[in-house]
Amino acid sequence: MIIGLTGSIGMGKSTLARMARRLGVAVHDADATVHALLGRRGAAVAAVLAAFPGVGTLTEGIDRKALGARVFGRPPALARLEAILHPLVRRREAAFLRCCGLGRRKVVILDVPLLFETGGEHRCDRVMVVSAPAFLQSQRVLRRPGMTAALLADIRARQTPEVVKRLNAEAVVPTGLGPRPALRALRANLTMARSGVRRWRRGKRTYRPHA
């Protein structure tokens, strides 16, 4: 079973992915893949430099801050970047799934921040959304270096609304009460997935921002 793990910025998705790994689940991290693609001698570096000259070098990779300044708030530029990165991420993801299939893993997780925004839910048997109250989300995100309220507002505007994610997912894992309740919820969902139990609430899967 392929579980798509997603959640808006600051909801605790990365923490939940780490928990899943500790429980023995194979996790493909889309964000980490992007970092590798843009890093030193990364597979996307040449194409990104061709599209956005001056944001890095072929040997040292891409300066993510410089790249962000060129694309955030500029939909055509962001679309150009995504057209470079998304196919490469999909290839890495497909290779991961092939390896998991060879290893006969019953459950794997695709950790994808923009799962719904890119149509990634169609590649998953189930979708698990990580959620927390908006005030807690803001507290977490604004503690990050370089983050501002304006930047957070821009990120939120580009992400699928929280209520829509919850409605379109089969499982919602709350992180607002701390790690222990989140871990319990994760364990319960993984147990159902591994046993083939079909008690997961079917998500509506009606949101189509990518259509």
Swiss-Prot record:
The keyword Cytoplasm applies. Keywords: ATP-binding, Coenzyme A biosynthesis, Cytoplasm, Kinase, Nucleotide-binding, Transferase. Belongs to the CoaE family. Residues 2-204 form the DPCK domain. Gene3D superfamilies: P-loop containing nucleotide triphosphate hydrolases. Its main location: cytoplasm. Its EC number is 2.7.1.24. This is Dephospho-CoA kinase. It is an enzyme of class 2 (transferase). Catalyzes the phosphorylation of the 3'-hydroxyl group of dephosphocoenzyme A to form coenzyme A.
